[in-house]
Amino acid sequence: MSPCENDTPINWKRNLIVAWLGCFLTGAAFSLVMPFLPLYVEQLGVTGHSALNMWSGIVFSITFLFSAIASPFWGGLADRKGRKLMLLRSALGMGIVMVLMGLAQNIWQFLILRALLGLLGGFVPNANALIATQVPRNKSGWALGTLSTGGVSGALLGPMAGGLLADSYGLRPVFFITASVLILCFFVTLFCIREKFQPVSKKEMLHMREVVTSLKNPKLVLSLFVTTLIIQVATGSIAPILTLYVRELAGNVSNVAFISGMIASVPGVAALLSAPRLGKLGDRIGPEKILITALIFSVLLLIPMSYVQTPLQLGILRFLLGAADGALLPAVQTLLVYNSSNQIAGRIFSYNQSFRDIGNVTGPLMGAAISANYGFRAVFLVTAGVVLFNAVYSWNSLRRRRIPQISN
C-alpha cells in the first residue's frame, strides 16, 4: 500500500489534483520534443527539403495513429484491472521509450519508437475515466473541465522549455529530461492516486456488443465520438499553415517565429481560463447547451480569420476561439459520463481517445491539402464549414435523445 493510501474513503478532490498534475507532466513531456522534431529527424540522416518534410510528418503522425489503434485495448484492460494501473503503465512505458529515442541512431529506429510511444500512451483518457467514475455526477463538468487544463498547461509550457533546453544542452539530452519527467509522473501516481477497484475476470467482462447494449443511448454516444473527431480535425487543420499565414500577414519583420509562437499559444491560455468555468456552468444548465453554443461560437470566429489583415487581429480571434475550444471536449466527456456506466468507463473514454487521435492525424493533412490548392485563407472557411456541420449534427443527435437527469 502506498503512503497516500489507507482505509479512509477516497477523496476525489485530492485524486483530481494529483491526476491534474499527472496530465500536466505528460502534456509537458509530449510537447517538450515538438519544437525540434524536424531538427532531430535531420540529425538522424534525413536530408533534402522534401524528404525532411515527409519524414517529419510521418514521425509526428504515426504516434497518433498507433494510439488510436491501441486505446480500445488499454481501455478494456482498465475496466478489468483498474485505471490506476493503466496510469502507471502509461507513464513508465513512455518514460522508457523516451530514453530509447534519445539513443536512436537512424530514422527507422526513431519511427518505430514513435509508433511504440503511441502504443504505450493513454495517460490522459485513463485519468479522465478515473476521475469520471469517482466524482459526483453533478460536478462532472467542472471536474473534467479542470482536469483538461492540466494537459493544456503542460502543452503550453513544453515547447518553450523544450526549445530552451535544446539550445542549452543539445537535442538528445532533452529526451532524457523528458523521460525523467514521465518517471516523476509515475511515482506521483503510484504514491498519491487512490482507487478502490475490484478486478474483473476476462469471462465476466462485457463484450463489444454487450457494451453497446448497456449504453443508455448508443447512437448518441457514437455521435459524441464523431463530434470529438471533428473537433480535432478542425483544430489540427490550422496547425500546418499557421506560421506561414502569420508571415504573410506580418510582412517583412524579423521576429515572425516569436509572433507565430504567441498566436499559437493564446488559444491554450484562453482554454485554461474558460474550461473549469464553462464546465461548472454546464453542470448547472446542461453540457449539451455548452457544446452547441461553443461550436456555433467557433464558426463565427473562424470565418473572420480568413479575412484578417494583421497578426494582432488573428491573435485576438484565436484567443476567443480558445475560450470556446476549452468547453468542447470537457462537454463531450461529461455527456459520455451521463450516458455510460462506471463498469465500461475505461473503454468508452478510450474509444473517444481513438476518434480524437484519428482527428489529430487527418486534421493537418486536410489543412495542408486545402492550403496547397486554394491558399491559406480557404483553410479557415472550410474549417468553419466542418465545425458548422458538427454543430448541426450534434444538435440533431442531442435533440433526438433525452439527456439523462443528473444525479448525485
UniProtKB/Swiss-Prot annotation:
Tell me one GO molecular function of this protein.
transmembrane transporter activity
Classify the protein's membrane topology as the record does. Multi-pass membrane protein
Bilayer-spanning residue ranges: 16-36, 58-78, 92-112, 115-135, 146-166, 173-193, 224-244, 256-276, 290-310, 319-339, 378-398
InterPro entries assigned: MFS (IPR011701), MFS_dom (IPR020846), MFS_MdtG_subfamily (IPR050497), MFS_trans_sf (IPR036259), Mutidrug-R_MdtG (IPR023692), Tet-R_TetA/multi-R_MdtG-like (IPR001958)
- Indicate yes or no for the key word Cell inner membrane: yes
Q: Which CDD domains match?
A: MFS_MdtG_MDR_like (cd17391)
Gene Ontology process terms (BP): response to antibiotic
Among the entry's GO cellular component annotations, what is one? plasma membrane
Cell inner membrane keyword on record = yes
Q: What is this protein called?
A: Multidrug resistance protein MdtG
Q: Which organism is it from?
A: Escherichia coli O1:K1 / APEC
Q: Which gene encodes it?
A: mdtG
